């Protein structure tokens, strides 16, 4: 079974549409942080209206929408997003699970135990083993830090699919993953930049190394 893993779309409709034009898969997994961006309602409805097997999990920013609490996202961002979503759309976000399994692959947003936990490609194996404790999967696919990576933690292959809508990378574009069973291919799609003229904060940009160092510092503060 071919599965496309699209993570951290962040309301970036041009990036999503560019990726969807390339996706050839039996299942599309939406890995969380779907709406926190310039076009939240339009992005969610594009995904929900697809004539495809689309399965969602929640991310921390999705949860912050319906919990109406301060999280990792700036408050003005969440106010912007909530104001553009219908009550039905917010209830849909509320219904999303933390994880999803397809065969021997487990999909989660950040880690299997927490949608906000920060671990990176350079986090010590010991910390990843703690986060993966009890996981009975051959492959774990995550996102959250917007940087693609592929590493082995014990018997578990750990893959970060990257970010479709807000990647931290040297090359602008959309980053995602395509799985065929437990085989994984990290993918990149060229796309137009989103319209951020109404976006309330500066649209974030960083290289993968800069972002990894930043998130690793946050990770140490969390531990």
Residue positions per predicted region:
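Glycine-rich phosphate-binding loop signature in dinucleotide/nucleotide-binding domains
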Residues: 22-24, 50, 102, 133-136, ...
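Anionic-ligand binding region
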Residues: 122-151, 156-159, 174-176
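Core catalytic region of metal-dependent phosphoesterases/phosphodiesterases
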Residues: 4-94
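Active-site environment of divalent metal-dependent phosphoester hydrolases
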Residues: 10-15, 36-39, 61-66, 113-115, ...
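Active-site-proximal beta-strand elements of phosphoester/diester hydrolases
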Residues: 2-10, 104-111, 158-162
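Active-site-proximal segments of metal-dependent phosphoesterases and phosphodiesterases across multiple
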Residues: 71-76, 105-135, 167
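Short acidic-hydrophobic surface loop/beta-edge motif
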Residues: 98-103, 151-153
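Acidic, His/Gly-rich catalytic cores of divalent-metal-dependent hydrolytic chemistry
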Residues: 152-223
């Amino acid at each position: 079974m071919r599965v496309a893993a699209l993570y951290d779309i962040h309301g970036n409709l041009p990036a999503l549409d560019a990726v969807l034009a390339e996706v050839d898969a039996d299942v599309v997994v939406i890995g969380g942080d779907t709406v926190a961006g310039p076009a939240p309602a339009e992005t969610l409805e594009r995904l929900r209206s697809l004539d495809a097997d689309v399965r969602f999990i929640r991310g921390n920013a999705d949860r912050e929408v319906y919990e109406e609490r301060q999280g990792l996202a700036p408050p003005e961002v969440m106010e912007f997003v909530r104001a553009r979503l219908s009550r039905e759309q917010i209830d849909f976000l509320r219904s999303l699970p933390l994880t999803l399994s397809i065969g021997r692959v487990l999909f989660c947003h950040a880690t299997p135990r927490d949608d906000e936990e920060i671990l990176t490609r350079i986090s010590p194996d010991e910390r990843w083993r703690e986060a993966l404790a009890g996981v009975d999967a051959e492959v774990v696919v995550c996102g959250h830090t917007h940087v693609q990576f592929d590493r082995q933690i014990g018997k578990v292959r750990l893959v970060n699919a990257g970010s479709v809508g807000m990647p931290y990378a040297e090359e602008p574009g959309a980053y995602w993953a395509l799985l065929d069973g437990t085989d994984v291919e990290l993918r990149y799609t060229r796309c137009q930049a989103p319209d951020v003229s109404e976006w309330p904060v500066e649209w974030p940009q960083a290289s993968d190394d800069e972002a990894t160092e930043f998130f690793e510092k946050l990770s140490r503060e969390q531990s």
